[in-house]
Regions:
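Short, well-ordered beta-to-alpha junction loops that form the rim of enzyme active sites
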Residues: 2, 19-20, 91
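Non-cysteine beta-strand/loop elements that form the S-adenosyl-L-methionine
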Residues: 13-19, 44
Length: 174
């Protein structure tokens, strides 16, 4: 809503509260399970491909996804820095939760997977009070971003190999 924008023209002056570096602790920052088969499928180097398949689940541990997973910690920053311009980031997939975050005093929110899954999500939220993106949190998009472009499996032009589709289905049932 435009009444919530609070002068975002100077958004570059705000601080984004982050959970760290994706390259150092990917699933802590992004949450969920890393789709090891999908990630290794796109690797060109044979020894890396098989090494990741064999040891990936120990190298990249899963961290359960919960919507707005950094909110509890971010609220501590908000309380300690009441006048600081802060942007919340971390697992926002519904208008309801975005409204909750903004109502908690954050100046803006940042989203990634929700928009990758549904590029028109922000426009849909303007129309629907209960808008929620359809991201299943299989993290296929993350698994392939290290070797080819980042993309949601729900919007690919090509058909996925059955082994990758099976992995995605299993991860999205959790």
């Amino acid at each position: 809503d435009t009444d919530r924008s609070r002068g975002l023209g100077d958004v570059y002056k705000r601080q984004v509260l982050s959970g760290g570096f994706v390259s150092k602790a990917p699933m802590y920052v992004m949450r969920g399970a890393m789709p090891i088969r999908s990630m290794s499928y796109y690797m060109n180097c044979w020894w890396l491909k098989y090494g990741v398949r064999m040891f990936g689940k120990w190298m990249i541990p899963s961290v359960p996804f919960k919507e707005a997973y950094f909110l509890e910690d971010a609220l501590k920053f908000r309380a300690a820095l009441p006048d600081a311009p802060l942007i919340y980031v971390g697992g926002l997939v519904s208008r309801q939760k975005i409204d909750e975050v903004l109502d908690s005093g954050f100046d803006a929110v940042q989203m990634a997977r929700a928009l990758l899954n549904e590029p028109g999500f922000v426009n849909r939220m303007k129309q629907e009070q209960q808008a929620r993106c359809n991201c299943g949190h299989s993290n296929y998009c993350i698994g392939r971003m290290y070797t080819i472009e980042m993309a949601c499996h729900q919007h690919l032009k090509e058909q996925l190999p059955s082994s990758l589709q099976k992995e995605i289905d299993k991860l999205e049932k959790k």
